[in-house]
Every structure is written in C-alpha cells, then in structure tokens.
A protein has these predicted regions:
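Nucleotide-activated donor-binding/catalytic signature segment of Leloir-type glycosyltransferases, i.e.
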Residues: 323-343
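Conserved donor-binding/catalytic core segment of Leloir-type glycosyltransferases
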Residues: 232, 273-300, 425
Length: 454
C-alpha cells in the first residue's frame, strides 16, 4: 500500500511530540513494507537539508510544473520505504497567528540585511540552500517568493496548493494528514485524485486554546474531520472531543495510541548524572496554557513549604515562559525554579539523569509522549488525569490538573519515600515496553484498508 503522508515536522528538526510521533509511526510503516511519501513544509528548519526538493508557491502552475515528477527527495537511513519532500511554506509546528507573523517578519528582516559577500546573512535570508539556479530543462518546481502576504490560514491554503502539485506526480492509495494545518491539503488532494483521506487528530483547538477557540481554525478542523473517510484519534479523550464538539460519528473514529521506540536495552548515553543533595522535580514540555505550567508552580510552592531541599526544573519554551518566570518570582520560589529553554540531545538526557520525578500537569493532553520517555529513562511519573496516556499507563501516579494540593502531596510522597520511587521506576520501566510503534502502524494499516474499501 502507498501512503501520501502530510505532516508538520520530521526528525532531526522537531519541536515537540508531533515530530517524534510522525517519525515513530512512519518508521514502523516502513518496517511493515508500506511505501510512504512524506510531505512537510519547510518552516525555516530544513534549509540545512541540501537534498530536499523544494516547491515554491510562485510557480505551482508555471512552466516547470508540467515537465515531469520532481525527482530529488530526502531519504532517511533505516527507512527503506520512505521518501520525504519539502514544500516551500512557512508553516511550522504549534504555530499561531502571532508566531506566524513573527516568523514572516524575521525572514523579511533577514532579506533586508543580507549584503553581497555576507554568507551568513545570505544563508539566513535564503528560502532554500540552492547554490545555483537550475538549468531551464531541470525537473521540478522552483523559484518564486517564499515570503507571502496574508495570514496563517492563507499560508495553510497555499501549502495545500503545493501539496496538490506534489500529488499530481506521484501514485498513492490513501492520504494521511496529521493535524489541522494539513487538513485542507488532504481534502484538496482527495478531491483531485479520488483517493480516500484519513485525518490524524493529535490535538484539537479545544486542547490548545481552552475556551478561547479560534473559530476559523475550528472550522478547518471540522471540515477535515467530516471530509475524511476515517478519523484517527490518539486517545479516547480525543475521540470524545471529536464526537461531541465536532459532531463526527463515533463509528468513523478509530483510537490509535502513540508509542515509543523500543530497543530492548536501556537508552545508551554518555551523560553522567550531576550529583546534588537536592531532589529534582522535572516539567518537560511546551510552556503553554495546554500544559498547565502555572499548576506546576503552584504545587511547587506547596512542596517547598514542607521540604527545602527540592529544585524544580522547567524544560521547554512557549508563549507563557516569561509569565511563568515572573510568577515564580512573585511566589517567592524563583531561587528554587530553573528555566532551561527548549532542550534536545545530551542536554535533554542531562535533565532526565538528574530528575527524581517527572510531572505532567496538562490541562488537556490528547496523549502525552513525555511520560513514556521519562519511564524509559527510569524516571517515575506523576501525570494529569486529563491526558490520553493516563488511559493506558498503570504504573504512574495520577492527579487532576487543578488539584494542586494532591499534586503536591504526591510529589512529597515520592521524594520522601525511596521504596515508592523505586517501585514506580521499576514497574514503569517494564510497562513502557508494551508501547510499540509497530502496533500503532498495524492499526493504521487496518484503517487505510477500511478507508480504501468503503
């Protein structure tokens, strides 16, 4: 079976759980022999990938469009049945209207300051790393402006046009679209090709925005869900939102839980644990309303009222980080809270090595991969009951996100009672092995077949 997959991000350039999930699922599909063409927007990240073929909105219907299939693809070691192609779009994961506008302004400033002979400025301003203009007979679609007038939704629809051009030159059986920014593209390609669309709901506007829902984004999500042949939800929690808030028939929805890469051995790392007399409690994730960072700090203050040898680490970035720094200071606990910014690689392994407990206080978490990553690294976890992962994880402490007293009590219990911490660590590390991407991939293949047959 051949899948045209539309996503926001793909390793090594990731900013959150969506990229990790896309990679895990795509690799497992490849291991099952499923052919995947993965289309993703440039978003500024993949300009370092010199072998990525980039389409530009300036010539989607131009002279080169009819000259044949674009033949320069990005291939990834270990993914035998996967090809990736990047389209020249500023879309990026977890984007909002404000962050989209800021990104356009940054790229515009880069163009303004780029001077001849200044390679760093030129590289910052360039839409793609093209060392020379293509010959007139070269295949593919290139050129055209990469900075667009208009808003984020306009960019979403421009991305849809570029994806439709990719689809014209490739054969596939099913379209698989991840989250709302790719839904219009999926609908467009489905209408043009007659092939079934499967949308994958990793989060909804209600998860991201609470009561402050953006009506236009909601409309895009709803149109994608209703226009799709099948809807994959990452949890029963998400399925409930999809059916109750978007009016999608329950029989059209399939729950496919996320997973984690399982190697059968502890994760290899050269990172040493930094010895400290303090207990370390870790928050790891985007610092946004959805993740509940203010509840983490409120619980931290209560913990520090009864324990003075605890430090709280907030690892991540997001639109609430400045507010959380100010809140920690206002609470009088700023000296006990460390904000690290976004972490990856060895820096991420360092904080896991230091952590005595990982806390996920999310207000609304469709799934939540970070607790599985923590358990895989022998870190016990305390998770919000308002999360998808709480449906399937047994050996974890659970709490309502708003119950800061109970959250603080459970943090103290783990830190003060080593046998409890040891039990959670050992049982959790064993339990996490059951979350395999191959199982998720097999479930998706079943959905593809059902979509293709109906």
């Amino acid at each position: 079976m051949r899948i045209l997959m539309l996503g926001w991000e793909f390793p090594p350039f990731i900013s959150g759980g969506l990229g990790t999930a896309c990679y895990g699922l795509t690799k497992a599909l490849s291991d099952l022999g499923t052919d995947v063409l993965f289309v993703l927007p440039r978003g500024g990240a993949d300009r370092q990938l010199h072998r990525v073929h980039v389409l530009s909105a300036g010539q989607t219907g131009g002279r080169d469009a009819g000259q044949g299939e674009p033949r320069t693809y990005w291939t990834v070691d270990g993914l035998e049945h996967v090809r990736l192609i990047s389209v020249d779009s500023l879309l990026s994961p977890y984007q909002t209207e404000r962050t989209y506008t800021e990104q356009r302004e940054r790229e515009a400033r880069g163009r303004q300051v780029a001077e001849p002979g200044d390679p760093e400025a030129a590289e910052a301003a360039a839409p793609v790393p093209a060392p020379a203009a293509p010959a007139p007979t070269s295949q593919g679609i290139t050129g055209g402006p990469s900075l667009y007038a208009g808003d984020l939704l306009g960019e979403v629809h421009r991305y849809a046009r570029l994806v439709a051009e990719v689809a014209r030159h490739n054969d596939f059986d099913v379209i698989h679209a991840h989250d709302w920014m790719t839904y219009p593209a999926g609908l467009s390609v489905s209408a043009l090709s007659g092939k079934p669309l499967v949308v994958h709901v990793h989060s909804t506007e209600f998860d991201r925005s609470g009561t402050g829902v953006n009506q236009q984004v909601y409309d895009v999500e709803r149109a994608g869900m209703h226009g799709a042949r099948q809807v994959i939800c990452v949890s029963r929690l998400t399925r409930g939102i999809v059916t109750s808030r978007y009016g999608v028939p329950e029989g059209k929805c399939r729950v496919v839980y996320n997973a984690i890469t399982i190697n059968g051995e502890p994760i290899p790392t050269t990172v040493e644990r930094i010895e400290t007399s303090d207990k370390i409690v870790l928050f790891l994730g985007r610092i946004t309303m959805q993740k509940g960072p203010e509840y983490f700090l409120a619980a931290a203050r209560k913990v520090l009222e009864v324990m003075d040898n605890v430090k709280f680490v907030m690892a991540g970035s997001g639109d609430m980080i400045r507010r959380m720094i100010e809140l920690a200071a206002a609470m009088g606990i700023g000296h006990r809270v460390t904000f690290t910014g976004f972490l990856r690689g060895d820096d991420l392994e360092h904080v896991f090595k230091m952590a005595d407990l990982y806390v996920m206080p999310s207000v609304s978490e469709p799934f939540g991969l970070a607790p599985l990553e923590a358990l895989q690294r022998d870190v016990p976890v305390l998770i919000s009951k308002q999360s998808g992962v709480s449906e399937v994880l047994t050996h974890a402490l659970k709490v309502d996100f708003w119950d800061i007293n109970e959250m603080a009590n459970k943090i103290v219990a783990v830190l003060r009672h080593p046998p409890l911490q040891k039990t959670l660590r050992e049982h959790g590390a064993f339990e996490v092995r059951k979350f395999a991407w191959l199982d998720a991939a097999r479930a998706c293949v079943d959905v593809y077949r059902e979509a293709a047959e109906t």
